[in-house]
């Protein structure tokens, strides 16, 4: 309850307040404020939860993309390595084949040269034998000889031995 007076003294206003109504109004206002703060807190909490969830989804998507990239890169490295190994094996096989061919050709050339020298020695021996058989030696000397074939030339050693 309250009484108010004007300074002039003309008007007197008397206000009688019901305490129950005032307390009810105050309680309603406080409840509205609480609801607003609760709703505000809820909105803030909901925003935080939504932000966390969006972040989780983004991280999950990025992780999935990174794993997919890693898998593709690993596959590509493996494929490149297999191709490189295949090329190396093919190059090694070609090299070995060429080396075998060269070695075989060299051995055939060496064999041909040695055979040619052998044929020369054989022809020389035939010539010497033929001349020796045609020659009538009265002392009947013996011939002892040997032949050495080297890579570059041919050596004969013939000894005539008188008994």
Curated annotation (Swiss-Prot):
Stretches assigned to the IQ domain: 42-71, 98-127
Domain of life from the UniProt record: Eukaryota
SMART domains in alphabetical order: IQ (SM00015)
Keyword Repeat: yes
This protein's name: IQ domain-containing protein F2
Pfam families: IQ
An example molecular function term from Gene Ontology annotations: calmodulin binding
Record's keyword terms, sorted: Repeat
């Amino acid at each position: 309850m309250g009484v108010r007076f004007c300074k002039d003294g003309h008007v007197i206003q008397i206000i009688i307040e019901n305490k129950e109504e005032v307390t009810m109004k105050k309680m309603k206002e406080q409840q509205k404020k609480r609801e607003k703060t609760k709703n505000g807190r809820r909105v803030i909490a909901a925003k935080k939860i939504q932000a966390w969830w969006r972040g989780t989804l983004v991280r999950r998507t990025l992780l999935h993309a990174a794993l997919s990239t890693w898998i593709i890169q690993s596959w590509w490295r493996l494929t490149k390595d297999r191709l490189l190994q295949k090329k190396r094996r093919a190059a090694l096989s070609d090299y070995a084949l060429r080396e075998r061919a060269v070695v075989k050709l060299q051995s055939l050339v060496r064999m041909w040269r040695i055979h040619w020298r052998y044929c020369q020695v054989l022809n020389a021996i035939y010539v010497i034998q033929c001349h020796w058989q045609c020659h009538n030696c009265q002392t009947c000397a013996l011939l002892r000889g040997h032949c050495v074939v080297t890579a570059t030339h041919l050596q004969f050693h013939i000894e005539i031995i008188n008994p």
